């Protein structure tokens, strides 16, 4: 949390790596018995870190890269490009909503939000005209819509925040940042240190501990904001509707996931 810049009351950050989580620094912990968030004592005196996670984020998009978008992966490697960049460029040509396609990323079972351990991944709305570009965009949107369900919990706790920090490998994707901004309806801030935030947090603890730095706000000088992604108002409406459909469909899929798991045990 410290290395990501969440060192003051109400600061929120979103980490996207293999898994993903959203966390807030606050004087009062997030006490939700139905969700059971992770609560940690902050290294900042008088603060807690409340964390809600999903278990399949970047690894779901990696699956898209390796299984669905293998041709783009090989093309990118031949050109000396990051495959994720080429896939994102392809997906960016598809309009928001991926032409009626939804992706559910829980490919490793349930998480803090989806408690059913049998929860699985799914594409819903798949049509004959959809291409790999549609599937790639739907994946980025689906992971982001799952995280929006997490963010809704934090908006109850910190109702007036307008921006959040994004760290981890997911912060590198231009399209993903824009999708997140539009779904969250928040400005996405990417600090200059996104991959080594744990090491930066350790350095901050040491620096403050020995009196080298006055407090943990030193992180703002060390890890400055390198990019801001603003909300595109024209795309907010469709994502608000998709968020409703996503949440409704996730609930409807809960029982079939359990039945499929039971059937699989019989094979």
Predicted regions and their residues:
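Glycine/Thr-rich phosphate-binding loops that ligate phosphate moieties of nucleotide
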Residues: 24-267
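Conserved active-site beta-strand element of glycosyltransferases/polysaccharide synthases
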Residues: 13-14, 23
